[in-house]
Amino acid sequence: GIDALKSATFRFDRFGLEYVAQELLGRGKAIHDPDDRIAEISRLFHHDKPALAHYNLEDCRLVIEIFDKCHLLSFLCLRSQLTGLELDRYGGSVAAFTNLYIPRLHQAGFVAPNLPHGAIATSPGGYVMNSLPGFYHDVLVLDFKSLYPSIIRTFHIDPLALVHGLQEPEAETIPGYVGGRFSRKHHILPGLIDHLWQAREQAKTEHDQPRSQAIKILMNAFYGVMGSVGCR
């Protein structure tokens, strides 16, 4: 349950059942005092087993109600359908990317290289600053809609586009950094992003929050995966 909440981008100060249940449902475990819980469970085991059964059943009810309220099972099923990952697989951004990208790469007539042995190079990634008030006045905060997927779609950031772009006339390509050039005609990710983008817009129109969230997480993962040493 904790990993499922984190995968769906829920954030809590603590992920214990008591805390999450109080935050989402307004009620908690049948034994509220965490400092006395173990002693109370031991007492119930020896002297009041029906009350102990009630305590365990209430824990189960809380978990089920949290899953229902957050649409977690729907989210996990949809994520599995989109990525091909097992229902209980958490993280797995590289595996999800591989499942979606490699078959399309093969259809384009290319084979991805194997991972180099002992690769340890890392990329710094992006840095998100916290919004702490009081340092500056008149600060404008801009929230770009699906920023990373938009960059991929607009500038054709894509391994196949890079391979073709380096072989095509420079004037017919989209310039990148460190001498990189991306093909305007031959690419995979921009089309995949566009398909997922439209699917997410439809999900939002239909108020299908689990599907919308699953697609959003998948699209955002594409950007970081390409800088990962674990990605072919």
Where are these regions (language model features)?
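Exposed alpha-helical structural elements
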Residues: 16, 20, 37-40, 51, ...
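Residue-level "edge-of-site" marker
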Residues: 34-35, 118, 165
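Helical catalytic core of nucleic-acid polymerases
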Residues: 133, 137-138, 144-232
